[in-house]
Regions:
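Generic beta-strand structural signal
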Residues: 88, 102-104, 131-133, 154-155
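Short, positively charged patches
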Residues: 1-125
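Short active-site oxyanion
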Residues: 65-67, 130-133
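Phosphate/pyrophosphate-binding betaalpha-module
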Residues: 124-125, 132-168
Length: 168
């Protein structure tokens, strides 16, 4: 919850990761002023003011809309933690156990041709459901990859960068 609150108060994902990394090296609990300084935020006073102005009951309600896990949790995918600017907090819906299986990422154009969709279908069929298909949920190649996997009895993970309750 605290990571979510930091984000809502204005820290970027990278600033939160910096704070979490620093926090691992000290034995005492960090004060909000320390967090503002360590994070490198542009205006610590504004961050702290926003933090204290947050309605905790409302934010908690918003936070509880979907289950989540953070980069500090054991279920956080190791391979995701190795990328630059790994998401500090992820919300999910569905089977979290799919993260434990070998995966293949599929990325492509939102305006794919019928040939592109057929190519994705062929590649996914060739995987013979040995890998979990990971892709966005945008139209085009992303959707074609998910559909091909599901039509062939496979499993998928959809990554939505905007959040589970934001539609575009």
């Amino acid at each position: 919850y605290e990571i979510y609150k930091f984000r809502k108060a204005g820290l970027t994902n990278q600033q939160i990761l910096t704070v979490l990394e620093y926090d691992e090296t000290v034995d005492q609990e960090l004060l909000l002023g320390d967090i503002a300084e360590i994070s490198g935020c542009r205006n610590p006073a504004v961050f702290m003011e926003r933090y204290f102005q947050i309605d905790d009951a409302q934010l908690e309600k918003e936070f509880q809309k979907f289950p989540s896990f953070s980069i500090l949790d054991d279920c956080y995918p190791w391979d995701l933690s190795e990328i630059y600017d790994a998401p500090a907090l992820l919300f999910y819906k569905g089977n979290l156990d799919l993260l434990k299986f070998p995966k293949v990422a599929v990325v492509g154009s939102r305006s794919c041709s019928s040939q592109g969709a057929k190519s994705v279908q062929k590649v996914i069929q060739g995987l013979e459901n040995e890998l979990i298909v990971v892709s966005g949920l945008a139209k085009g190649i992303d959707t074609a990859a998910h559909m091909a996997a599901l039509q062939n009895g496979g499993r998928t993970i959809a990554v939505i960068g905007t959040g589970l309750d934001v539609f575009y």
